[in-house]
């Protein structure tokens, strides 16, 4: 098994460098790859903020990656759950925080929008503002 870095996946999804995109496609087609969770986090950031892709396209790329044969994504179950939460209006990082907190009864945050969106959609665990 070989691990793969963010820039290889970015070339594959963005197709912005023909030579590197061709190589990236061949690497992914060869399978037996491992994608660390940190690569997924960086890929989402690169696609959204560097390449200025709309969230829907970013989420589609991540969902595609999670379904590729021969590609093992670290904590793939949490990323799949996070992408489902994104369909409820959460941004990716908040969705991932919530997905990773699945065994907890609640997630505490000072982010009022995150708490409100999660509450309106009855997402679990519950998200609330901390109090004394």
What are these regions (language model features)?
Residues 1-35, 50-59, 68, 121-132:
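Short, well-structured N-terminal submotif of metal-dependent ribonuclease cores
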Residues 7-8, 38, 112-113:
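Alpha-helix/helix-capping structural signal
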Residues 19, 68-113:
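Active-site neighborhoods of divalent-metal-dependent phosphate/nucleic-acid chemistry enzymes
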Residues 32, 43, 49, 53, ...:
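Mobile, glycine- and charge-enriched loop segments
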Residues 37-45:
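Short, conserved active-site loops that position catalytic residues or coordinate cofactors/metal ions
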């Amino acid at each position: 098994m070989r691990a793969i870095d963010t820039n290889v996946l970015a070339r594959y999804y963005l197709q912005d460098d023909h030579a590197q995109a061709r190589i990236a496609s061949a690497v992914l087609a060869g399978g037996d790859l491992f994608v660390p969770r940190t690569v997924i986090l960086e890929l989402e950031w690169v696609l959204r903020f560097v390449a200025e892709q709309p969230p829907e396209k970013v989420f589609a790329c991540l969902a595609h990656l999670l379904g590729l044969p021969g590609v093992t994504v670290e904590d793939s179950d949490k990323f799949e759950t996070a992408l489902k939460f994104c369909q409820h209006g959460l941004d990716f990082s908040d969705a991932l925080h919530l997905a990773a907190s699945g065994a907890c009864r609640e997630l505490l945050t000072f982010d009022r929008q995150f708490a409100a969106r999660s509450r309106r959609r009855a997402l679990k665990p519950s998200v609330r503002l901390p109090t004394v």
